[in-house]
Amino acid sequence: MRYNTAKLLVYDAEQVSKGIEKIQEHVENTEKYLSLYESTVINETDRIQLQELKALWEKYKSLVDKEVELVKSGKTEEARQLLLSDIDDIGDTLRDYFEAFVEYNTTAAKEKVDENKQVASTASTVMIVVIFVGILIAIALGVFISRIISKPIGQMVEAADRLALGDVEVDVKAETRDEIGKLAESFKRMIENIREQAYVVERIAAGDMTVDVRVKSDKDLLGKKLKEMVDTNNEVLSNINEVAAQVAAGAKQVSDSSMQLSQGATEQASSIEELTASLEQVANQTQLSAKNANQANELAEVAKNNAEQGNKQMAEMLNAMEEINNSSSNISRIIKVIDEIAFQTNILALNAAVEAARAGQHGKGFAVVAEEVRNLAARSANAAKETTELIEGTIKRTENGTKIARETAEALNKIVEGISKAATLVNDIAVASNEQAAAITQINQGIAQVSQVVQTNSATSEESAAASEELSSQAELLKRSIAKFKLKNMGKMTSNRYKEVSPEIMRMLEDYTENKQPKSYSKEENGEYSDGKETAEKDVGGLKQKILLSDSEFGKY
């Protein structure tokens, strides 16, 4: 710009006009760069220096404008004096300011680069520490959650063992509201149901047939069978009570039939023992499956928690990389501004060299200074270029790392979803296995009770055969046996006893003795298995009733 102001004094009007345009262009560019630099001020010292530079620039610009006006007015000598005095002095000062700015910003840029390297190193160290601490926390949480789950599971296992030994006075406390608490609540309801059914069986064993059996649902097989057994026993014992007077007349036929019933009951007892052993084996296998399913559920829950923790840490790493990327972009913009300033400084150095050449012998020292300024500007431009390339490479690698981290986060999300589904399935398997084990235990108890009933029937049959020779003693024994039971609707039972044996009963007993076949099981047309039960009808009080005549059923009579 100083070169252009000097040209105004030596060239013709056309060159003067072009010089004025060049001066205006330099003024606009300089003010644009000053405004751009002002937006990137890094500290208060830089801001104060910039304000001083702008004030000096305004003074320099006003002197240049004054020179232009003098040249336009034809006052060339006054313009020359102004150029050689005030404009040159302020120009030198302004050049010194620009050189100081270049040196200051170069130093600040180097310090900023070193600071960014230190921040990146610190961030890496912090990230490693955070990941290590997160792993320790995840392990601690896994151990803590495992203990929370294993304690109530252990209590339920202990209760199940006691229940398997026949102790119905066990209790399970549901202290939580999670899945374990729900499982404990279900286990508690199951124990209460078994305890209630055990109480019913105890009353039945004591001979109280007035007990009311409540069926929990359509799938409550044991409850329905207990109710059927109570109703059947009530019906059977009522019928026995009604036909007790006829037993004396049919003692001989009953004696023969009782021997056969005893043999059939013995065979049934043997079959039931084999069935009980098989059910116990199935029950043990089912309990083992339930235990394994519970352990798998715990492991799946721990894996799910670890995957979720890793996903959270990946999200934090993405945020940190995004911040590093933004900082690198800002530094890149600042380096570009420094590069532009170095370019302008180079131009100014060239102008200064031209001026020194024009000054001849007196401008040699100034030419040396201008050459050094130009070299410094070139070195600043090269350093800014290399720094820009490094920062751009860092940005690209950061973006690539961010992409990989996002893909890893998405994969972790899919892993969390898969583990959640697997945990749900394993939990369902565990619940189903526990329910199967409980159901098999109940069935095993029911079969044991049936076995006791069969053995009792066998003994009763033998006793009936031995006592059938004494008609009166048999009748009295039967009455005493019936008196042990408390039956429903005792007040409504007829007190009319048959003093003579019904001809229909006699024919029924004779037909049964002649046509009795060995017990066998066959598949009916409806797909169910039949045990060869025979039925007969009798007319009691004008009502027809079906009486089962198979080995097991007739033994109850």
From Swiss-Prot:
Annotated positions of the Glutamate methyl ester (Glu) modification: 274, 463
Recorded topology in the membrane: Single-pass membrane protein
UniProt keyword Membrane, yes or no: yes
Residue ranges of the region described as Disordered: 511-542
Transmembrane segments: 122-145
Domain Methyl-accepting transducer: 243-472
Listed Basic and acidic residues bias regions: 511-541
PROSITE patterns registered for this protein in UniProt: CHEMOTAXIS_TRANSDUC_2, HAMP
Protein family membership: Belongs to the methyl-accepting chemotaxis (MCP) protein family.
Record function comment: May bind attractants or detect changes in the extracellular concentration of soluble sugars.
Protein name from the UniProt record: Putative sensory transducer protein
Protein species of origin: Acetivibrio thermocellus (strain ATCC 27405 / DSM 1237 / JCM 9322 / NBRC 103400 / NCIMB 10682 / NRRL B-4536 / VPI 7372) (Clostridium thermocellum)
Taxonomic placement: Bacteria, Bacillati, Bacillota, Clostridia, Eubacteriales
